[in-house]
Amino acid sequence: MALTPQDIGRIANLARLELSPAESERMLTQLNGFFGIVEKMRAVDTAGLEPLSHPVAAIQDIALRLREDTASEPDQREANQRSAPAVERGLFLVPKVIE
């Protein structure tokens, strides 16, 4: 699947983007490169292969080194909220933006 300059123009219009001719050409090259990679991946025969839930699951000998989940800095909530125009029960209040 290869995109045309018209496809890029339509995508840019749908995304409300205004692309210069150079940006449009670069986008065309990048997207066609991406679709080329996807086509190569689709060409690989994966029949009979069990899907992996996680790539590391294929290698049983790897021991993940996860650190302890601990706070590394003191709680600065009150100090950070002093400059806020409105705070309620420890949360920043913001104006409603969606009707």
UniProtKB/Swiss-Prot annotation:
It comes from the Bacteria. It catalyses: L-glutamyl-tRNA(Gln) + L-glutamine + ATP + H2O = L-glutaminyl-tRNA(Gln) + L-glutamate + ADP + phosphate + H(+); L-aspartyl-tRNA(Asn) + L-glutamine + ATP + H2O = L-asparaginyl-tRNA(Asn) + L-glutamate + ADP + phosphate + 2 H(+). Disulfide bonds: none annotated. Keywords: ATP-binding, Ligase, Nucleotide-binding, Protein biosynthesis. GO terms for biological process: glutaminyl-tRNAGln biosynthesis via transamidation; regulation of translational fidelity; translation. Its EC number is 6.3.5.-. GO terms for molecular function: asparaginyl-tRNA synthase (glutamine-hydrolyzing) activity; ATP binding; glutaminyl-tRNA synthase (glutamine-hydrolyzing) activity. Pfam families: GatC (PF02686). Belongs to the GatC family. NCBIfam families: gatC. Allows the formation of correctly charged Asn-tRNA(Asn) or Gln-tRNA(Gln) through the transamidation of misacylated Asp-tRNA(Asn) or Glu-tRNA(Gln) in organisms which lack either or both of asparaginyl-tRNA or glutaminyl-tRNA synthetases. The reaction takes place in the presence of glutamine and ATP through an activated phospho-Asp-tRNA(Asn) or phospho-Glu-tRNA(Gln). Heterotrimer of A, B and C subunits. HAMAP family: GatC. This is Aspartyl/glutamyl-tRNA(Asn/Gln) amidotransferase subunit C.
